[in-house]
C-alpha cells in the first residue's frame, strides 16, 4: 500500500539510494533488493528487519527503488537475464503473468512455504514467485461527509453510477496507477463484457480521474485532505493508516471501506534471473516470508502478511476491512488483455 504523504516525500528522496545495513567487522556479501516506490525509506522497523538479516547472515542488502509497480516490472523485463538487482519485491497479481512469461525470475520454492496461506500459492504452484503479502483495493468513503449530508452509502460497484453519487467519486488512471488498474480489473470481473458501459455511466455521473493514488487520496478526497470528493479508490487497510498517522491521536477511523467494491492484490518476490548471487538471493527470499520480516509489514506497508503465523496489530483488527469475496481475475487473462483494456478505458473515459 501507499504511504501517508509525510513519508512519501522521504521515500522519494531515498529513491535509488542504497539502504545501509548494520556494520560488521568483516565486509559482508552485498545483494540488491529491487522494490517499488511504496517501500519505506530507511529508519523504519521494516528496514531494521533487513539489518538484522545482515547481522544473522553477513549478507548486506542494498534497497533500490525502481518506481511504481508497473515501472519496476517494465525495467525488469528489459533487463531480464542481466538484471539490475538480485531479488525483486512488489510484483502483484496484475503483473505476475508478464514477469513469468518474460522469464524475469528464476524458479525457487522458498523455505517456509508451509506457513504461507495456501490460497496465495495457487498462482505460483511451480515456484515461479513467492507470495509475501496481500491486500485489497476498495472504494473508501469519508464517514463525516456522509453523516453530515445524510446520504446513504453506496453498496457496490453498480451503485456508484447512481445519480445520488454524482460528482462524488475520484479514481486513479489504470495506465499510471496500480490501484487504478486494480479498480479497472474489479469492474471487468463484476460486469464482464459490460464493463465499458459501466465506465460510460461513471463518466456521465461525473467520475474524476487522478494520475495516481497520492493525488487522488490527498488532494481530491475529502476524508484526508482539502478535496471535495467523499469517495476514492484506495485500500481496505487505509482506515487503520489514518489512525496510526493522525497528527492528533484519534481512537476511531475517519474513513470507511465499501467491502463489495474490492479487488484482491497479492504481492510477490522473486530471484532475478541472471543474478550473480543466487544462494544469497534465496536466503533473502526465505527471510521475506519469515515471521521476523512478515511481522513488520502491516504497519509499514499496510498490507496483510502472507505468513499465517503472524499476529496482526490491534489497529488492523479494529479498522481494516478484509472482504469475504473480493473480485479476482486470472493472471493469464489479465496478461492477454491488459494493454487493450487500458486503451479502451482511456478512449472511453479520457477522450
Residue map of PLM features:
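Early extracytoplasmic/lumenal segment of secretory-pathway proteins
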Residues: 26-98, 225, 351
Amino acid at each position: 500500500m501507499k504511504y501517508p504523504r509525510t513519508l512519501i516525500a522521504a521515500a522519494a528522496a531515498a529513491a535509488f539510494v542504497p539502504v545501509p545495513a548494520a556494520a560488521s567487522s568483516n565486509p559482508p556479501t552485498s545483494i540488491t533488493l529491487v522494490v517499488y516506490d511504496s517501500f519505506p525509506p530507511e529508519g523504519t522497523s521494516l528496514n531494521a528487519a533487513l539489518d538484522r538479516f545482515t547481522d544473522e547472515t553477513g549478507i548486506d542488502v542494498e534497497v533500490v527503488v525502481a518506481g511504481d509497480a508497473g515501472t519496476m516490472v517494465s525495467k525488469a523485463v528489459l533487463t531480464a537475464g542481466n538484471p539490475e538487482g538480485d531479488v525483486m519485491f512488489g510484483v502483484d497479481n496484475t503483473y505476475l503473468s508478464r514477469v513469468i512469461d518474460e522469464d524475469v525470475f528464476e524458479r525457487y520454492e522458498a523455505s517456509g512455504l508451509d506457513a504461507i496461506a495456501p490460497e496465495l500459492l495457487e498462482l505460483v504452484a511451480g515456484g515461479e514467485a513467492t507470495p509475501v503479502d496481500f491486500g485489497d483495493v476498495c472504494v473508501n468513503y469519508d464517514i463525516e461527509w456522509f453523516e453530515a449530508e445524510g446520504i446513504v452509502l453506496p453498496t457496490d460497484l453498480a451503485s456508484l453510477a447512481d445519480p445520488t453519487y454524482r460528482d462524488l467519486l475520484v479514481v486513479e488512471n489504470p495506465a499510471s496507477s496500480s490501484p487504478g488498474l486494480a479498480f479497472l480489473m474489479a469492474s471487468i470481473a463484476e460486469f464482464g463484457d459490460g464493463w465499458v458501459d459501466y465506465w460510460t455511466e461513471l463518466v456521465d455521473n461525473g467520475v474524476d480521474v487522478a494520475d495516481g493514488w497520492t493525488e487522488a487520496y490527498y488532494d481530491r478526497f475529502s476524508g484526508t485532505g482539502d478535496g471535495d470528493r467523499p469517495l476514492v479508490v484506495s485500500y481496505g487497510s487505509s482506515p487503520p493508516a489514518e489512525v496510526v498517522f493522525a497528527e492528533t491521536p484519534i481512537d476511531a477511523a475517519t474513513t470507511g471501506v465499501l467491502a463489495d467494491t474490492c479487488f484482491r492484490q497479492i504481492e510477490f518476490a522473486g530471484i532475478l534471473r541472471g543474478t550473480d548471487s543466487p544462494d544469497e538471493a534465496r536466503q533473502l527470499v526465505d527471510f521475506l516470508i519469515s515471521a521476523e520480516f512478515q511481522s513488520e509489514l502491516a504497519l509499514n506497508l499496510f498490507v496483510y502478511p502472507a505468513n499465517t503465523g503472524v499476529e496482526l496489530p490491534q489497529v488492523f483488527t479494529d479498522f481494516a476491512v478484509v472482504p469475504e469475496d473480493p473480485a479476482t481475475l486470472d493472471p493469464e487473462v489479465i496478461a492477454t488483455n491488459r494493454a487493450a483494456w487500458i486503451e479502451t478505458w482511456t478512449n472511453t473515459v479520457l477522450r
